[in-house]
Amino acid sequence: MTRFRPCIDLHEGHVKQIVGGTLSDLGSGLITNFESDKPAEFYASLYRRDRLTGGHVICLGPGNDDAARRALAAYPGGLQIGGGINAGNAPDWLEAGASHVIVTSWLFSADGQFLPERLAALVEAVGRERLVIDLSCRRTPDGGWTVCMNRWQTFTNLPLTPATLSRLAGSCAEFLVHAADVEGKCRGMDETLLPFLADHSPIPVTYAGGARSLADLQLADNLTGGRVDVTVGSALDIFGGMGVPYADLVIWNHRDPSLSSV
């Protein structure tokens, strides 16, 4: 069944919820839905208490390492870490308590060309079983998707296709896919992308972007046959949202899987 995957998004050392498509190097045009007065480790401890697994900490730009390390220390082995990951620092993040490292931008050249030798270096450094590839994407005019990097600012040369998923699945444990065009907007999920991922990903995959209610988790479960997990961010009450009580998602995750619609 589709599970809720918790998140901790860090920007300038603070827990925030940001409209994904507004991130930029200059910071101009940034739309922030929520900035917490609580530290990252508060949320990590909450997820640990409620036995929520497979969540992630994402560092959006510089200045987040200390906050990320505190979160990982609060829930050792319970959270993945992404943002600025490369073959050099990935082992250190695992040592700091991350269950997996999540990588996107480092797999590409500055102009967005996929570099398979870097993926091989990461697999060598941490092992396939500790690696998550972030294939966060944006829509293209032809109705498909292209993987984006640099906080979703730069389109790469890697289309999100069945062949891409099949090709990369042998080098990682999971995929993480933010639908950047709807991320942080609480206006609904990409209902075409969800079943596409379910049909074509040979390994576990987590979708993020636009989930706004508990009904959206049920919708994802229906659309994917329970094969894709979902992250809920800006709609959560613990992140200032009004669409989804966190307590309801804890109950959802711990319910009898036989009750799931498949």
Locate the predicted segments by residue:
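Short, well-ordered coil/turn segments that N-cap beta-strands
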Residues: 1-4, 51-54, 75-79, 98-99, ...
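Catalytic cores of alpha/beta
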Residues: 66-101, 192-230, 241, 246
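N-terminal active-site wall of soluble small-molecule enzyme domains
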Residues: 25, 36, 40-94
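C-terminal helical cap(s) of enzyme catalytic domains, especially alpha/beta-barrels
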Residues: 113-125, 217-262
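Glycine-rich, proline-tolerant flexible connector loops at the mouths of alpha/beta enzymes
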Residues: 51-67, 105-113, 177-186
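Charged helix-capping and loop-helix junction motifs
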Residues: 115-120, 157-162, 187-195, 245-249
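Conserved, mostly hydrophobic/aromatic
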Residues: 9, 47, 55, 81, ...
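Conserved anion-binding
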Residues: 11, 15-26, 94-182
